[in-house]
Amino acid sequence: MIKPKQDKPLASALLAQAKEVLEFVERTDVTDFRNWLLGDLSKPLVCIGNGGKHTTYPALLYGISGGVGKTATPLEFASMSPEAVKRSKVLLLSSSGKNMDVTYASKRAAEINPEGTAGFTFTDNERNCLFKNLNRHNIFCFKNPYSDGFISIRSKILTCGLLYKAFSGKNSFTDKLNFDFKYDYFINKSGELPDLKRIKHFVLLYGSYGEPVAHDIESAMVEGGIASIQICDYRNFCHGRFIFAGNHCQSNKVPETDVCAILLTTPREAKIAESLRKEALADNMPIVQIHTDLDSSLATIQLLMDSLHFVFDLAEKHLGLNPNSPHNFSGIDKRKPMNSVRFVTALKEHGELSH
């Protein structure tokens, strides 16, 4: 087994501080941020993160609050017409505001819709492009005493906590969360349960409050060098997307199972997941089920913590990996592609999309 690199803290050690992080959120004032988020719900909210991050949670929370929320990567934001940007509110989320993704997105949003664009950040200095490009009264800068390594762990939980508090208006919520993280690993109906180290592919299914978690787990799995992963909502999986999973379970044509289904469930998905197990998953499909009894947007945070616990358990205990400092056998510098692939230059050559 490959030994985890110890140049950075183990991912599981950072996750263990989740309660402390969320108690910090409870003491943080989010009043101004809440007022901006919930002002003029008739306008869609476009949520943009740094490259590599999906901003599904604020989009979901905005939808629950009565508006229409849309998540967009910086490249997807480039495909939105100026008219669409003008008619929307734009929320840019960036811890430091220092990479070219948020620099591009903040410049474009501020040029088209300066009053309707806001920034969420943890860094208050001259290197943060949000302070250079946006109106100061629309920048919401929060303290973040929690650093991370290669992947976002504590700052991800901090961000989700601040978003939940701002949208829900609830100042106390950690008492509703379970910090004894858990998941269940079992065989669907019959057969031998494989060791997790034999699994090369994961199929993650979600609904409602689980969607933001699905994107975060995909990112953690792939960026952590752990396994390939397909994410899909429960209904779309029934439209033929079960074929790959079934073709990778042991049979007279397949020597060894190397796939596992991950089911994210709340009370809303429990019956759907049970039915799907019977109708769309092989009898000998190994399953990881991550469930919460919470039936509110707080369920996203519980599912996130339990899901990260599974991912880090898989990596550290079964594969000998530290997702917070992944092995990189290709030799490609982990940070180089962010700056060397010049997407902004290419976009400017062709201008706005057209019919």
Predicted features by range, described:
Residues 1-40, 149, 153-162, 168, ...:
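Cofactor-/ligand-binding subdomain signature composed of acidic, glycine-rich
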Residues 147, 163-198, 325-355:
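Internal, active-site/partner-interface "lid" segment
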Residues 59, 158-169, 220-223, 301-317:
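Short, hydrophobic/amphipathic alpha-helical patches that form generic packing surfaces
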